[in-house]
């Protein structure tokens, strides 16, 4: 049995960063990864990087003289080449640390300090003083007759490897993941249909913003089937056949590819956490405290697996929290990192930090609200996409920014300016009067916050 100070399960953003940090301190560390295809974690291999590469390629589609099929296949092949390089670079960076050993295999707890690692028929055991779980999450597949991932039925992770151009694509779910893929494939030339049980997209967002998103997608030619309950799925050599009901009426749809985008679930089943006495939530995520410790103080959970926001930058921040604790400070915890922004690469990009208007009113705030159509922003005209809406929510009692939603080109960059203002508790007037360079999307913050009354 191998005995080490630290065992990390999962080669994600937090896990790989922590492995190098501990190794550089001279602490013997083992990092276990189930699949060599996942060195570096979800973001690099099957998430942010490949999806945004394809989204960027889709945006450039009009500049190519290739057929849709040729252009799409070349984009996928280029994506695969990039991911292979990043995967190898991530492995090499960790494996080159003299105090870190990378083990390929499936890790499962034998007891609260011992983990078995299975690689084919070989089984080894590792005893560690501290264990850090960074196994992430995976796409959730709802229970529908015939719904099995295969040649023509995909998750967000498998669709990006499809080299054959789909002339038609149905997407189950109108959340951010489904909408991201809908935009990319519509721009590649695919006929896209989104199926959702709800009666509108993005129900958690403010209605005025959601309406702008819907209009933008309809402008791309994306069809929406709201109030649609999927009954059955079948696939053959040429198509996927979907049976669904709308208002009690049974309907059929056949497409060349089908994407299931109905959320994500924790990768914890194979860990045998019960053997370690580690508690999980009803959804399978590991319960943690503000220092990311489980109910077993020497077992930590970082990244998506602990049930927090599923973004790679949160996984990196989880590393900072654990590092603070291990350095005997513990001064930086989950409680100190608000506010956290997010961006979804829709058409155009959707970004938000803090509260929506709906959330602010539900919490009882007295608020001021300002909106700005993206058509009023000069840089949007230059970029060739004037779709979108900026929206700000301000506390009427102290002029603090409660939340901002930016639906517009380059919002993933602009939102970080707002985050900094909120973190440093600046009044909204700072952004109303800030001198910005011109022409930029950021300068529209002058007009947005200048409209706060």
Predicted regions and their residues:
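Short hydrophobic core segments
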Residues: 7-9, 107, 126-136, 172, ...
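Beta1/beta-strand and adjacent pyrophosphate-binding region of the FAD-binding site
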Residues: 1-12, 165-175
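Flexible, glycine-rich terminal cap/loop adjacent to redox cofactors
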Residues: 9-37, 42, 49, 53-54, ...
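Glycine-rich dinucleotide-binding loop and its adjacent helix/turn
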Residues: 48, 135-191, 195, 223-224, ...
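Glycine-rich flavin
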Residues: 2-4, 21-27, 33-165, 193, ...
